[in-house]
Amino acid sequence: MDDKEVGRYWDENAENWIKLSRLGYDRCRDLINSPAFFKMLPDIKNLKGLDIGCGEGYNTRITAKKGAKLVAIDISDVFISSAKETELQDPLGIIYETESAITLPYLENEFDFAIATMSLMDIPETEKAITEAFRVIKPGGFFQFSITHPCFFVSKWNWVRNEEGIKTGLIVEEYFTKQEGQIEEWIFGAAPKDMTDKMRKFKIPRFTKTLSEWLNLLIKVGFVLEEFCEPYPEDEILKNFPEEYDSTIIPYFLIIRCRKPIK
């Protein structure tokens, strides 16, 4: 499966994804992943950045409001069209473009930093995407990204429950089994069932790597590893959204920051 085919899947996913996420049903993003991502993000005021796999622009807009001058790309025309419409309504100076992460049309050392929020694990030829990110970042600049946690998002797993039926752990199987474009189908569980029953489920091609493969790939490309985060919901979130309890048992996400060394 190549990036063009992946783009077609995301074009088909985009309408329902945009509708549900903007209604607040992407709870893991809004309550856990994005808050941790931006807490970890360095000061970016007046820096030029690239958002790789921006989707409809939710995290791009948060980044821009922190003072960065942003270019944002996605393989999906539908996502980019929606992001551009939002930019027209509420201008933040973001330039949105439909582009592939594996062939970035930008100059070497063009950006002070790059981010990728929950996109790299959905991109075929991940090594090319990370190599391209390295190429366009200036020496001394950073690359921060979030992915599904490679230790727990595997092809086969089961929850462990106690006598009361409460989840207490996770059994992970087939950790080393590769997914190379296998389609995962789901929809946001926080959305009302009477709404999602009428919707097409998301069909998402997955491209998995083990934890060591991710880290070794970054090192091979030339990045210096800098900081990691495995986000989980804080107590206040759990009081208001107890259904997020699962995220206190295992980390659903991994956030990594690495830096392009100054030669």
At which residue positions do the language-model features occur?
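A short acidic, Gly/Pro-enriched loop at the edge of an enzyme's catalytic core
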Residues: I102-F113
